[in-house]
Amino acid sequence: MHDSFLSANGGFVVSKKTPHGLRLKHLGIKTYHEAIIYMREDCHVCHSEGFEVQTRIQVTLGSRSIIATLNVVTSELLQPGEAGLSDYAWESLHAKEGDEIQVSHPKPLESLSYVHAKIYGNELSFEQMKVIIDDVLSGRLSDVQISAFLAASGAGRLTRTEVMKLTKAMIDSGDRLSWPSPLVVDKHCVGGLPGNRTTLIVVPIVASFGLMIPKTSSRAITSPAGTADTMETLAPVHLSPQKMRQVVEQENGCIVWGGAVSLSPADDVLIRVERAIDLDSEGQLVASILSKKIATGATHAVIDIPVGPTAKVRNQSMALLLKQSLEEVGNELGLVVRALFTDGSQPVGHGIGPSLEARDVLAVLQGLPDAPNDLRERALTLAGAALECSSKVPPGLGKSIATQLLESGQAFKKFQAICEAQGGMRELTKARFTYPVVAAKEGKVSLIDNRKLAKIAKLAGAPKSKSAGIDLHAHVGESVEQGEPLFTIHSESLGELHYACDLLRDKQDIIILGENP
């Protein structure tokens, strides 16, 4: 509604719009990071303001304010005069049951005009990118509006200059760490490969050499395990920025969950929306990786790019473009990037899922005879590249030095010290239920579908159930006999085990066997 009055000369004047008040009811609805407001279909505010389903509404409680998307309730869930909020919106406003909120139309968003400009192919300035990223982070742009920006930025529509501007805007959206050492190394994998948990081996190797490597890692969103999920089976990863700094200064390295420290927080929102629309854009990927590395305070970064038909990067031409973008944009922003191509044709190691991957990591660090050699070699290659960032390590000798640090036990000792500094080393758990999947015939493994195997591990309960996942027994190029296990599904519940087995009946081409020569 409006406050209105007659002016001295008899004219009708409309003054500032008065927000409407509604009483809050806690509904307990989770929408992840999306702010939703729930109002009755017959709500007087909806009628007077013209609010409809999906309308963006300014919601104010005291000094706090958010923009939320309207969902309309047609049942008696809400009483007249009441409104509900999603848990994310509730927490953002620090709301309590019975609080009165004010609702009104928000001001037009400047950022939305820049999103439209990008849709029509215009190049955006740094200031325009910054306005978009600020509105992404504050929640003023809805998920639908963010997805429009992501789609407009995909398929090579961002110029190299725009990628640099986007990266810088994302860095500026959060905190930026600084360290006393002039050389700070970081390591990252672009993803798409189950079991590729090299970080937990690379960090202690590099730290035991004396280089600083403060590693922030993500949790899984669509994969069976993120690095943070796997590390969490062995030590706490939810550290405050102060505790993280203490661990790094004490041990030269850490492996913590990046969500606990505010480094490029806008990237987390963009990733969430990207996953929902299944969109992978080279420009967004470069900005995502580099913004996190630079915000962590790194001066040098080693980037692992697995290349394979069912990996995130499917072929060599895509890999070359990504490598060039990472190195050029990194250089423009003062970060030395070394991108390495690795085999992405099949999972790394045996385990897929937090505890099973952690078991493989410990086997490599301890030099056990059953340690997966592919995980060991990949980790040594990446650790060697990281060591060569130091002037103390001649080019080409990094891997041999990394091997010495691993085989001498120094790396495992450092890993134990990092775990203790982060809160104490934990014992791994084992799943209650297992189901072996056997070869229907004899033959040689010719192909493994990374995505389908990862999906089975997720249906089995990973990463929520730390011990759930898959134990892979056969790799590409290996011969198997009829009836020999190809992989074993691990699950904490029979229900989830049955879900995973149901997918097996529909997907018979997860592991393809060719004829033995």
Swiss-Prot record:
Q: Name one GO cellular component term.
A: cytosol
The intrachain disulfides are none
Looking up PROSITE patterns in the UniProt record yields: THYMID_PHOSPHORYLASE
What EC number(s) is this enzyme filed under?
Answer: 2.4.2.4
Q: Which InterPro entries match?
A: Glycosyl_Trfase_fam3, Glycosyl_Trfase_fam3_N_dom, Glycosyl_Trfase_fam3_N_dom_sf, Nuc_phospho_transferase, PYNP-like_C_sf, PYNP_C, Pyrmidine_PPase_CS, Thym_Pase_Put
Checking SMART domains in the record gives:
PYNP_C (SM00941)
Q: Which molecular function terms from Gene Ontology are attached?
A: 1,4-alpha-oligoglucan phosphorylase activity; thymidine phosphorylase activity
Under which main EC class is this enzyme filed?
transferase
| Gene Ontology process terms (BP) | pyrimidine nucleobase metabolic process; pyrimidine nucleoside metabolic process
Instruction: Output the superkingdom of the source species.
Output: Bacteria
Look up keyword Glycosyltransferase and say if it applies: yes
Tell me yes or no: is Zinc among this UniProt entry's keywords. Answer: no
Q: Which UniProt keywords apply?
A: Glycosyltransferase, Transferase
Catalysis performed (reactions): thymidine + phosphate = 2-deoxy-alpha-D-ribose 1-phosphate + thymine
Family the entry assigns: Belongs to the thymidine/pyrimidine-nucleoside phosphorylase family. Type 2 subfamily.
Recorded protein name is: Putative thymidine phosphorylase
Naturally occurring in which organism (per UniProt) = Legionella pneumophila subsp. pneumophila (strain Philadelphia 1 / ATCC 33152 / DSM 7513)
